[in-house]
Structures are given as C-alpha cells and as structure tokens.
Amino acid sequence: MKRIFLLACILITLASPSWATKIPSGSKYDSRIQYVDYNSGDVVLVRALPGVGARIVFAPGENIEDVASGFTQGWEFKASHNILYLKARSMTLSHSNQSIDMAPEPGKWDTNLMVTTDQRMYDFDLRLMPGRNNQRVAYRVQFRYPAAAAAAAVAAAQKRVVQARMNARPSPVNWNYTMQVGTNSASIAPTLAYDDGRFTYLRFPNNRDFPAAFLVAEDKSESIVNSHIDPSAPDILVLHRVAKQMVLRLGNKVIGIYNESFNPDGVPARDGTTVPRVKRVIKSPGENLQ
C-alpha cells in the first residue's frame, strides 16, 4: 500500500506544471540594486513597495514597444527607450454612487507584467511587499545578456581573424628579376622585385616618385599596367600583372624590368586572391556581406 501511495505521489509531481520564477541577485553594495541574466524562458520576479518607484533596465540600444499587465488599474508604467519605470498606485472604486479609494495593499496588488521590445520579449511577476524597510525589494532590476556577450565576443574574434588574413602579405613565388637602367634613370630603379604569380611588386624607397609601368608585348608595343600602392607598405608599387617584360617610365627616365622565370600560367587564383584562406566574393549592389 505504501508503494502504491509513493508511486501516486511521484506521478502527481511529474504531471504538475513547473513554476520557477527567477529571482534577481542583489548588488554587493546595495541589495535593492538587482541583476538578472536574460533567458527568454524565464519569468522574473520584481518586488516593489507601496509609494516607492522602481525601474527595469534592458539592453543598451533596446527600445520598449509594448507594455501590458493583468492589473493596469493598480500599477503605473512609463517607458523610456530601454528603461521601464513602474509604481503601484491607488485605485478608485464606485459603489452605490459612492467613490472608494483603495491604496496599494501587499498581497492584493500582485500581478504579471509583459514587455515587448524591438529585440526581445520579457515576462515578470510583480509583487507588492510589506514593510517600509524590506531589503528584498528592488529599486532597479537590470538585465545582463551573457549569451549575447559571448556571441559578440566570438564575432569580434572572427572579425580579427578575417582582418589578419586580409592584411596578410601575398607569398612571393618568384624573385628572379633583372633590370636594365637607362641613361640618368637610376633614380627610378626599384630596389626589390618579385611576384606572387598574379601581381608584380616593386619597391621604391626614400620617398621616390613612382614611375608609370607599361607591359611590353611580343611586337615591342607598350600598354599601361594598372597599379596601386600597398596600404601596409607605402614604398611598394603593386602592378596588376605578371609579365615577361615591363618598362618603367617617368619623364625621360626609363627602366626595363625582366622576369627571368616567367610562367605564362602564373598562380591559379581560384578564390580571386593570392592570399591563403582569403576568398574574393562579388556581391550585387546593396547585398549584405555574410
């Protein structure tokens, strides 16, 4: 008989709904300043005193859109951006042509509160407490967002990794360059030349003016080569070609640049770049990068 009774108690317990209101933790400086971690499945307890206001603070940048309660006659709410101010208030009842004022009374003013912001939904139990010096009440309940903070930290770390990859210098694959210096042209001669199979890199130190670069075709005709200055190394001129022969010109000065290990196939830039683990993605106008 005892076993049957015990089994029945267990079944009743398992079948009963689980109510576990989350109680904010008080600050070590003042217990009336309270903090609670956000969880969309929690109902948070807010304890107030008659005649004393309180506020609920949501995430910075979050904006309150809607506030609802089961006892709006007995509570006053005022929303301002991410802060909700609340206070128990008196209510007036009419009976037999008489008006009766009822002051907030602990135990009779308890209700629920629902807040919707532009980012989340919140649920609360509002409880009016007795005792003017009750230390369990809240002057402020402030939410913390550990999951959002962790996600932001991961995103920031990923961004740093991507930025580091973007800032990585391409790996040189060919240093075998020679040059022919024209008369009085030494001032535009590069001190370093290499390529990564896709672009050619020339160094011009000491704040020298960069010459224009021209591609020399088999018939000796010349065509200008697009170029840019390396943002991370302002003394490097990046030519958007790898060629067997190029010419540098600045006024009457001329330098011949010869690629002694020219590979017509170059490096197959399948990802659109020659930087490892960096892929070039072309998006349509207005399309967000993921």
UniProtKB/Swiss-Prot annotation:
Gene3D superfamilies xref list: 2.60.40.2500
Keyword Nucleus included in the entry's annotation: no
Entry-linked Pfam families: CagX (PF03524)
CDD domains given in the database record: VirB9_CagX_TrbG
InterPro entries: Conjugal_tfr_TrbG/VirB9/CagX (IPR010258), VirB9 (IPR014148), VirB9/CagX/TrbG_C (IPR033645), VirB9/CagX/TrbG_C_sf (IPR038161)
Keyword Signal assigned: yes
Disulfide cysteine pairs (residue numbers): none
Record's signal peptide: 1-20
Keywords: Signal, Virulence
Family membership noted in the UniProt record: Belongs to the TrbG/VirB9 family.
Entries under NCBIfam families matching the protein: VirB9
Protein name: Type IV secretion system protein virB9
